[in-house]
């Protein structure tokens, strides 16, 4: 069982979408099932409507989930399991306030050492616990031994004892921390494999320790995806437009092309242009590079252009391109759905022609409107020349403006073959 577990706290990042796609592909390959879990326990950061936005984006990418969970619905179980660990002395109550903890963190930072909880409350007597009026967090007791797990991309990953302290499971307000909620939910939902970002590597041993303390014997495999870098070779920030899936879609990239690019990124693939469905035949998480991959929007644009060429008429119409034959034609100079739509809309809109060309444009317009519109462009051109006596730039510039609304563009001869049936409608505007 695979899962994708986003938080409704902002726009979906391309790194998150990449993880969703990989989990989904693997779930289809072994027919094990795919869970969508909305991790909404951080009330302060949750944004209304972002869960629906997640559903909408996944649907656009044709990613279908078998079961939907909201993490907040499991709060009762998180608290019950924390109580179980306390009862079994595998966890303890911590009364340290935030001010004290922050002061210790600053001291560690000043000393150039990583902060590690010092166990202040771990060995309090029952009387000390019962007599303490302050609110308490719940921390897991940690054995002083190394932790390791096998990562399908990185291989064996090991953490020394000093790298994992007695971390918090439940905060003083009785809400679960990310690691506790995630570990419990994966256990309860029968998750067997998790593909997620490299920033979660240090969370994995903690989640394994939680389930181990609860006596859970089910095995969960992991693969941590390397980070995606921007064109400067730095970690892609959420503040960068191209890191947002919503922004890429609105800009005019097809879901098919974005999925293609994210599967291709840092991967060994038998070909460059493919669909998510086609990748099921050969995708393997083990082929993903351990090294960070650089996001190249120019490459994405090239892939987008190829998917526009391959798309059916029906699909292009779904994307707002009412003239599919023209859409494919304009891939010779455009890569985005939005750019192509602008080009086509310009052809079928009223043209604003400058005074320099207006007189000649009117002569050409009259000639075309009175023509029988031959199949051959050269025949129409010669017909216009005979009627107007216009030649060279005096003919072609106003004619181009009448057809496209632009001084530059494709060969009129090529364009004519695609729009001749509508040419009187176009010219008359």
Curated annotation (Swiss-Prot):
Localization in the cell: Cytoplasm
Residues spanning the membrane: none
GO terms under biological process: glutamyl-tRNA aminoacylation
Keyword Transcription (UniProt): no
Keyword set includes Transcription: no
Keyword entries, A-Z: Aminoacyl-tRNA synthetase, ATP-binding, Cytoplasm, Ligase, Nucleotide-binding, Protein biosynthesis
Record motif 'KMSKS' region, residues: 235-239
UniProt feature coiled coil, ranges: none
Catalytic activity: tRNA(Glu) + L-glutamate + ATP = L-glutamyl-tRNA(Glu) + AMP + diphosphate
Alphabetized Pfam families for the sequence: tRNA-synt_1c
Ligand binding (ATP): 238
GO cellular component: cytosol
EC numbers, comma separated: 6.1.1.17
GO molecular function: ATP binding; glutamate-tRNA ligase activity; tRNA binding
Chain span(s) of sequence motif 'HIGH' region: 6-16
Function: Catalyzes the attachment of glutamate to tRNA(Glu) in a two-step reaction: glutamate is first activated by ATP to form Glu-AMP and then transferred to the acceptor end of tRNA(Glu).
Family (UniProt): Belongs to the class-I aminoacyl-tRNA synthetase family. Glutamate--tRNA ligase type 1 subfamily.
Subunit composition and interactions: Monomer.
Name the record gives this protein: Glutamate--tRNA ligase 1
Species: Campylobacter fetus subsp. fetus (strain 82-40)
Taxonomic placement: Bacteria, Pseudomonadati, Campylobacterota, Epsilonproteobacteria, Campylobacterales
